């Protein structure tokens, strides 16, 4: 949803994190709730509102992140329809009990982070707008591109990590000696039934470092 002037080179390359503004905003919501909501939205620390009212504000002095913790709303119905792997401790629940066990928001701490890059902001916007209906993936061959600590929220489904709103490590789904949660059933189906292999036995075929790395991942 960014226009060209918002993502062109030299614009929004870095946006400062200003946690000291959080108390001022909270005070405004306590004393003047209607004025505050008109100015910064229903939840001032939700990613969509931070982008709309701060990062993309026409006022240059507002081009900051005014908190040390941002959040993304979780549409629980959409999440359950998506087929995402639920933490094992709530997998047995049904109906309203299951929905009640799912957090209302994904909270992302910015502690000790002084600024967010354009890449960070783009990732946050994609997560905020996917509504948890359309899966977002990161290839396992790609190194870390963001200082935001998302590793615990990844679930491996094959050669890709899927973004989720669950901190699987806290929920107890990351096994010993593992870095990420694994959706075993979906991974098995992808590797055994959906992936297509072949051609590596072609005489004289040259495998560059990128292709060879992918072969190692398959293995």
Task: Go through each PLM region and give its residues.
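ER/secretory pathway lumenal C-terminal domains and tails of membrane proteins involved
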Residues: 2-219
